[in-house]
């Protein structure tokens, strides 16, 4: 869907966005992050992008700092991994700054979280898809975080599980839709 590969340049927000959303985050396909003023707020570094993605996909629960350090720096000693995490948090807040970084990302001593009312995430829309509301499945143009493979072995394992979770949801809705269409077709044939 072309509207999700370009910055938001129209007054009508994509499905699922309301007036309180200030950042639109695309995690399916190549990662993108746009403010509502069409400013690119995607962090430059891959680790910083991965950090943003993990925090976004952890919602509505906060992402624990220890888990984030383990996912992104599994080959480093814990203290070094936590120091690297602090640097990446700083970079993430800097990148999100034009959209109100500190108001969007909550950072505490133990965890990080995104304000769900301030950030629209394409994966959230897909995960809310139902047989009655299947339109968000059209957002599935590519794999989840397809440009973030190879960051860390632990991250790669986490990413594989997340990709499977998104695929399973899409598959179950698509199969249910196909079954409904098949049943509707049989019922029309019987009524003829």
Task: Put a short name on every predicted segment.
Residues 68, 92, 166:
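Residue-level signal for inorganic ion chemistry
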Residues 1-23:
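Actinobacteria-biased recognition of intrinsically disordered, low-complexity terminal regions
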Residues 62-70:
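Short acidic, hydrophobic short linear motifs in intrinsically disordered regions
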Residues 4-5, 17-18, 41-48, 54-60, ...:
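Intrinsically disordered, charged and Pro/Gly-enriched terminal/linker segments
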Residues 27-49:
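A structural micro-motif at secondary-structure boundaries
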Residues 89, 93-100:
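C-terminal flanking helix
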């Amino acid at each position: 869907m072309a509207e999700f590969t370009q910055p938001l340049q129209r007054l009508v927000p994509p499905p699922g966005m309301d007036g309180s959303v200030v950042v639109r985050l695309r995690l399916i396909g190549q990662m993108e992050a746009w403010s509502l003023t069409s400013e690119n707020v995607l962090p430059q570094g891959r680790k910083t992008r991965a950090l943003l993605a993990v925090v976004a996909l952890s919602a509505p629960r906060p992402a624990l700092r220890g888990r984030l350090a383990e996912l992104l720096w599994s080959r480093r000693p814990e203290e070094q991994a936590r120091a690297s995490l602090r640097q990446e948090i700083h970079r993430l807040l800097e990148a999100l700054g034009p959209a109100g970084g500190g108001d969007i990302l909550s950072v505490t001593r133990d965890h990080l979280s995104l304000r769900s009312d301030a950030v629209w995430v394409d994966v959230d829309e897909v995960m809310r898809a139902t047989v009655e509301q299947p339109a968000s499945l059209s957002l599935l143009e590519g794999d989840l975080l397809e440009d973030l493979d190879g960051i860390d072995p632990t991250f790669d394992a986490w990413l594989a599980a997340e990709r499977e979770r998104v695929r399973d949801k899409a598959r179950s809705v698509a199969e249910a839709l196909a079954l409904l269409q098949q049943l509707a077709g049989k019922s029309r044939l019987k009524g003829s």
